[in-house]
């Protein structure tokens, strides 16, 4: 499932690059899509442990404090133990899932019809943290986290796909 997320994020990055090639973008739109492109590249690099899974080389000092012994930042023990990673995922899910209900038609925020791709993971991460803090959690993060990361990746791919399609249609109608 993790490689599926990586593939969707890769396609999302390709979509953002194609959106950036459109000449009619405002400066604000261009900055938003540059931000998304950088976000996708970092997200992909973190998911594949900055290539360690592909070439086998890692940074020992990071691997030593990493809960999975990998070269990535998101599995560093301090982030995992304090719930910071989960709360970050929850905040991202809430922002992307609810943002378009407040700010309409912004390339920064996915369309309302994509809300559940972000809100379901946000609710799960928040619930997991409350459950874990209470000490009576029947679920484990390892068994479920990839599913929710995958949902977010699907939502981000669909968001970039919709905007890419929208910009292509706008360009085509202006040339007719």
For the regions a protein language model found, what residue spans apply to each?
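Non-cytosolic membrane-interface motifs at loop->transmembrane helix junctions
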Residues: 1-3, 137-149
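Hydrophobic cores of alpha-helical transmembrane segments in multi-pass inner/ER membrane proteins
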Residues: 4-18, 86-98, 148-167
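Transmembrane alpha-helix/helix-exit interface in multi-pass inner-membrane proteins
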Residues: 41-61
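Juxtamembrane "helix-exit" motif on the non-cytosolic side of transmembrane helices
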Residues: 101-104, 127-140
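Hydrophobic alpha-helical transmembrane segments
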Residues: 70-93
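Aromatic-anchored segments of alpha-helical transmembrane domains
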Residues: 39-46, 120-133
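Membrane-interface helix-boundary motifs at transmembrane edges
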Residues: 19-31, 102-112
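A generic, lipid-embedded transmembrane alpha helix
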Residues: 8-13, 34-48
């Amino acid at each position: 499932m993790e490689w599926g997320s990586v593939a969707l994020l890769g396609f999302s990055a390709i979509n953002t690059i194609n959106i950036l090639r459109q000449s009619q973008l405002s400066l604000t739109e261009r900055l938003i899509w540059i931000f998304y492109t950088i976000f996708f590249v970092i997200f992909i690099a973190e998911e594949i442990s900055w290539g360690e899974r592909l070439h086998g080389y890692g940074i020992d000092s990071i691997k030593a404090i990493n809960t999975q012994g990998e070269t990535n930042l998101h599995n560093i023990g301090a982030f995992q133990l304090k719930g910071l990673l989960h709360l970050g995922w929850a905040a991202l899910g809430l922002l992307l899932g609810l943002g378009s209900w407040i700010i309409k038609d912004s390339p920064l925020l996915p369309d309302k019809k994509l809300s559940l791709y972000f809100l379901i993971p946000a609710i799960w991460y928040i619930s997991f943290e409350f459950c874990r803090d209470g000490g009576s959690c029947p679920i484990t993060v390892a068994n479920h986290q990839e599913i929710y990361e995958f949902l977010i990746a699907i939502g981000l791919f669909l968001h970039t796909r919709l905007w890419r399609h929208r910009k292509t249609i706008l360009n085509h109608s202006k040339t007719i």
